[in-house]
Amino acid sequence: EEIEDPRAEPGMVVVDVKAAGVSFPDVLIVQGKYQFQPPFPFSPGGEIAGVISEVGEGVADWKEGDRVIAMVGNGGIAEKTSAYAATLMPLPESMDFKDGAAFPLNYGTTYYALKQRGELKKGETLLVTGAGGGVGTTAIEIGKAMGARVIAAASNQEKLDIALSLIHI
């Protein structure tokens, strides 16, 4: 179904989507099993990377042409989507759109879990289960950056090999 392009409402921008992350919440939303269900029709895709094409009233820190990543809730698997300016993060030129689109949910979830909830301290031991997946791999990276001794566990050798490549960074 064709839908109208989003408009930049006050406090928002429109982003030309170059890449969208597909994460576990997206799967659950499509299956109708997530904690919220957007009204139909909707497009999944909660995290995106792209270029701002329109800036809404009251947005001072962003301009057309800026490369950004954002958490948009849903609607990211589209040519264009809208995002609140306060949720945007700059996408460095050194990071491609594909990597940028996978960044916010995995790294944000991990940082929140380790820093805010777990209060991980330098020198502590961190056991990462599911170490070959998106959040697991970021937990290895962030845990090491925070000075923890990281132990990785995964369900098969292929996933362990991914984890080992990160542990020995």
Identify the meaning behind each predicted range.
Residues 101-103, 107-166:
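Mid-domain Rossmann-like dinucleotide-binding core that forms the NAD(H)/NADP(H) cofactor-binding site
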